[in-house]
Structure formats: C-alpha cells, structure tokens
C-alpha cells in the first residue's frame, strides 16, 4: 500500500470516527436540551437559549470540519470533549430531576393501615378465632367495611361488629375486658396515645391490612399569586403516612410584589372538618386523620380561598435542613426552657441549630399563650428558613438540600413549577418580604369532638373579628395590595 493510499485510508477512518462521535454528541446533547426545556431548567437570563446555541454551534463546526475534511484530529478532540461535557451535564440534570421528582412520588396518595387488635396477653392469635369485633362504624364505617371484606376474602371469616362511639372508646372497652377484639385504624392511634401513652404495650395486632387513599391533583396556578398549605407532622414511618397535622400554615405568595404571608391556624381551632369529618366541628389537627385533602378543604372553606399546592413535612427530620443552612437566627420574645432537649432560650436574638430549633417549635406548656405562642415560634423558624432558602447561595446548593430531605418532604408542586419559581428568583434577584399572622380565639373545654366524642378536649373557639381580619390580609396579598 502506497503512502497516498495509507493517508487516504487513515482519513476515511478518521472521518468515520468523527461521524460516529458527532452522532453520539447530537444524541446526548439533544436529550440534554429536551430535559432543560421540559423542566424549565436555566430558564432565566436566556441561559437555556445560550446553551442551545452552544450545542448547535459545536454541532455545526463539527459537521463542517467533517464535510470539508479539515483538522481531523482537532475535530476528534472537539467532539470527544463535547461528549464528555454533555454526559456530565446530562447526568447532573437527571440526578436533579430524579431527586425532585421523588418529592412528588407519593403526593397523589396517602397510606394507612387497619388492624384487628387484642390484649397483649390474650391467647387469641388469629382472626379465625374470633366471631366479632368492636369498632366505631358510625365515624369510620367505610374503612372498617374494607377490612372486614378483606378478612372474609383472605381468611374465610365473617366477623360481626359491636358498635362503639370512637376508636378510643373501643380501646377502653378492650382494656376493661368488655370485648375480646377491636378494629384499630392507624391514623387514630396517636389520638389514643395522647390519653394512654403506653397503649401500644397493652395490645397486639393479629391482622393488619394496608390501604392507600387517592389525593386530589393540584390546582395549578397560572397567576403570580398562589396559596401553599404547609402541613407539619411528627410521626414515625414514611412521609406518605396519614397523620394528624400539628402545624397548619397557609403560605400566600405574590411573585409580583415579592410578598409572602404566613397564616397560622392553631391545631386546636374549632372548625367544620371537611370530607371524612362530614363537616362536623372538631379541632383542626384531627382533619389530618382523614388525609391531607381534608385539611386542605377545611382551610379552603374557613378562609374562602383556593389552595393550589401543599407541602407536607415531618417536622423532626425537616429541621435537619437548618444544619445544611448553617443554622438560623430568630427573635425570641419570652424566656423559656423547652421540654425537648432542656434548651434555655433567653429573650432576644437566638441562633438555632436543628436540635435547638426542634425544642423551640415544640414547646407550648412553658409559653404564656400556649399553643398560639408555639404557632408563632413555628412561623419564626419557617420564616428564617425561607429567608435563607431564597438567597442566591442556597439556590446554588438546591440539589444537596433536596437530596437530604427527600424522605422528609412530600409535595404536589410539579418540578416545572418549582423551576419557574427558582428561575424567577434568579432572574429578578432581591428578597421576599415575609409577614405572618395567626388566627385567634378563646380556649374552651366543653365543645364536642367528632373524632373523640367521649373526651373533654381543649378547643379554640374562633374569634369572628380575628377571622375577618385574617381573611382580608390573605386577599390583600393575593391581589397585590
């Protein structure tokens, strides 16, 4: 083979390699651009268009060099380098999308379980040994019937039900020896635990069935203002578990005026409970046992607004975010010692890490205004977190923050909406002005509870003038006033 033919053969090989490299580059870069535009990534200051232009420029230069058989070694270097950059970028974007999507993964359903329970020392070990159970069919009949149908199907056992007024009443009957077995819905267990902290050691579950409940799709907002329901639970198990909501904050956001209003509704507020609560009055925290939809609809009815999205968080693990942010600073207006952690908080500005923050937001018994003061402290910590999260520095660490909290937070806000908010903040800069308010009322012990009809519970009867003032403030922010 002559030198000319060798050069010709080498040139054909290099062109073939370059064509293959160009095809790989176009495939990777095309998929990368698809994700960038689909999820609105880099959609500020035209960075997504700049990225597109760079991709097309590299592709065009590579194509022209191949066609005109110029600088073949440089072409190989250019395409290999571009493939590496595209691969790394694509991996980062896919990781980011995957992490964020996990926050949405369980947003369309909630989980709970229903069990048949007997006394811990009972000789009964299987539901086939039973002929009847005690359960509150008047307040939770649908779930009870689901369990009975499952037992009949899987265990070939048909159980009759002795009526009780509530799950708490059923538990009392079991402990008193008036019944051999009860049905127990997991979402009501913390209600029993509030009166009988050692209840779990007194019983054993001989049959358990898990269920899921569909959650309503988000009411997507195309306006510059919207409402987010922030629900704080403090429970074991997955974030998708149904549980009482001890923190109930309505976050009203106006992107035009850069205002955020946090409205705290005390957990003991006496309100008509929507959905599973049959619009019967009870304390707000009990709405959570019927699912997050019930809490949302209850607050929508109370304040006369639409709630577009929700964020549900396990408060204990969520506060770990504070350590990622380097702690937060809040103003404490009364000296107190928290039961959790025995932390002492003086009057004035205090710097909190995650453990101190947990003690700060949990305490209510040492505070002058009890649960309302606790709600105000929760607001202070959330405001402090929001102020750090909306800083440019925090947005740069967005992926790290989400990665650490994916098992602690559940939200139905789509990734595209999240990215629109991030892009708008990066585009405009500045900080949001955050204000807060709380619904006020009078404490009473004589109001009936739909979920716990046999108990005398502390309730907060809502003050009508306070409700009117709170509703007006929410509307002002929504309307940009």
Describe the role of every protein-language-model region.
Residues 72-94:
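Internal/C-terminal transmembrane anchor helices
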Residues 1-12:
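Terminal targeting segments of Actinobacterial cell-envelope proteins
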Residues 10-18, 71-74:
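Membrane-interface helix-boundary signature
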Residues 89-106:
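Hydrophobic alpha-helical transmembrane segments in integral membrane proteins
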Residues 16-65:
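Membrane-embedded alpha-helical segments of integral membrane proteins
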Residues 104-112, 118-120, 126, 131-481:
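Non-catalytic, solvent-exposed segments at the cell envelope interface
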């Amino acid at each position: 083979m002559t030198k000319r033919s060798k050069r010709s053969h080498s040139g054909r090989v290099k062109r073939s390699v370059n064509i293959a490299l160009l095809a790989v580059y176009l495939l990777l870069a095309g998929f990368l651009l698809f994700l960038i535009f689909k999820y609105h990534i880099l959609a500020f200051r035209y960075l997504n268009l700049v990225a597109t232009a760079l991709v097309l420029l590299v592709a065009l230069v590579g194509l022209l060099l191949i066609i005109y058989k110029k600088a073949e070694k440089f072409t190989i270097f250019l395409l290999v380098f571009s493939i590496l950059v595209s691969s790394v970028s694509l991996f980062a974007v896919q990781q980011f999308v995957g992490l964020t999507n996990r926050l949405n993964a369980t947003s369309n359903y909630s989980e709970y379980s229903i069990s048949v329970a007997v006394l811990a020392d009972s000789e009964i070990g299987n539901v086939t040994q039973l002929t009847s159970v005690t359960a509150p069919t008047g307040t939770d009949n649908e779930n009870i019937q689901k369990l009975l149908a499952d037992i009949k199907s899987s265990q070939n056992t048909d159980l009759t039900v002795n009526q009780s007024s509530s799950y708490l009443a059923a538990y009392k009957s079991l402990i008193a020896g008036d019944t051999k077995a009860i049905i127990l819905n997991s979402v009501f267990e913390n209600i029993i635990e509030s009166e009988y902290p050692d209840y779990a050691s007194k019983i054993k579950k001989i049959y358990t069935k898990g269920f899921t409940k569909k959650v309503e799709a988000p009411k997507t907002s195309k306006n510059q203002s919207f409402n987010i329901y922030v629900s704080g639970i403090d429970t074991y198990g997955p974030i998708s578990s149904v549980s009482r909501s001890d923190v109930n904050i309505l976050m009203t956001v106006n992107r035009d005026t850069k205002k955020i209003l946090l409205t705290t509704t005390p957990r003991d507020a006496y309100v008509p409970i929507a959905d599973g609560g049959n619009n019967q009055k009870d304390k707000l925290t009990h709405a959570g046992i019927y699912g997050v939809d019930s809490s949302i609809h209850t607050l929508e009815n109370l304040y006369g607004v639409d709630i577009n999205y929700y964020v549900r968080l396990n408060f204990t693990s969520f506060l770990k975010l504070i350590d990622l942010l380097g702690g937060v600073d809040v103003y404490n207006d009364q000296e107190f010692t928290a039961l959790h952690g025995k932390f002492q908080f003086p009057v004035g500005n205090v710097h909190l890490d995650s453990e101190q923050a947990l003690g700060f937001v949990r305490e209510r018994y040492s505070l002058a205004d009890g649960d309302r003061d606790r709600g105000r402290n929760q607001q202070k910590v959330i405001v402090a977190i929001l102020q750090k999260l909306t800083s440019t520095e925090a947005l740069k660490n967005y992926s790290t923050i989400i990665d650490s909290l994916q098992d602690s937070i559940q939200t139905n806000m789509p990734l595209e909406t999240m990215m629109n908010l991030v892009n708008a903040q990066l585009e405009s800069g500045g900080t949001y002005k955050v204000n807060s308010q709380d619904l006020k009322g009078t404490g009473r012990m004589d109001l009936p509870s739909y979920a716990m009809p046999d108990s005398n519970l502390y309730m907060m009867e809502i003050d009508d003038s306070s409700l009117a003032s709170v509703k007006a403030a929410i509307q002002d922010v929504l309307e940009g006033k």
